[in-house]
Amino acid sequence: MALRKTRISALATLLAATTASGNLLAEELRLITWGGYAPDEVVAQFEEETGIDVKITLSNNEDMISKLRATGGAGFDLAQPSQDRIVGVQRQFNIYKPIDYSRINTGQLQASMVNATQESTALDGQSYGVPSVWGTSGLIVHSSVADTVTDYTDLCDPAVAGKVSYRLKRPTLIGFAFAMGMDPFAAYEDRDEYQSILAKVEDKLIDCKDNVKTYWTGGDQLLSLLRTGEVTAAMAWDAGGWKLNAENPDIRFVAPESGALGWIDTFAIPRRSENEEAAYKWINFVMQPEIAAKITNASGNFTASKGADEFVNAELRDAYRLSFDEEAINNIKWYPPVPPGLEAMEGQVLDRVQAAN
């Protein structure tokens, strides 16, 4: 009997050890993210260093919200929504949990981006996002007009008449408002004040129409116009400017004097995450400067990792440094969440600008 009990005990111990080992080997991080944000090289290094398998689902803001809303915040351990798509969604659907910043190595992050993300993802005194990848809208200019076009409203200068392009979208309204000395983001919660700002910007954009070669609608269209010289100054995304700079150093992206307009894609923890520990490990791992640089090289967008630009591809690094010194980064105007109703107000203004003679 004693021998039998000993054998049973030994078998139980072996099974327990096997189960524990199996759980360890099967540990998994389920990440829903954008294309380019989890390069194979980075995933392989993380898996090797931690023993955690990474399961990636490529997505976008709308799809992330849909999937997490359908499950009440289950199915994924880590998500990467944009910073302006968190608070409203969380208030309505409760699909995320607050970030424990004591578990984040903030020393390796750009302080201005941490502050911007904490502020824009704050709800009931808690923050729901950590900055990851960022980008901006600003100015792409040919060197021949670089001294003339240093802010959004300079696109209306006679020196670039007929050689200008920008989109009839929110960024144009916001950028012109800042360049005109107003703060549209501060007016987001005051509909009357925001309408007053839009009216002034509308008048400016109508007066500026003679300068506009075309209102661009697609990135490839704009890049083609800038390559041929049909357009010498435009409001556009930084990544497009850096791409052109690699082809022609006489074209570059400029952070406007009133501030580039910035977006941040974040890390957010789904409310029913099953491996929160792995999520924090991934965040701290990929935001190391040398690892973050690999994400920049893969996606074309820079990350919030401090010092990562030292390790990115030389051409991209040099173009970035030409566009953004520390002062320009600190001057970025980060998009806050958009209150209900503002899009309709903006749409009416843009329609009138389009129709004006």
Feature locations, PLM:
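Periplasmic-binding protein-like
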Residues: 198-208, 247-271
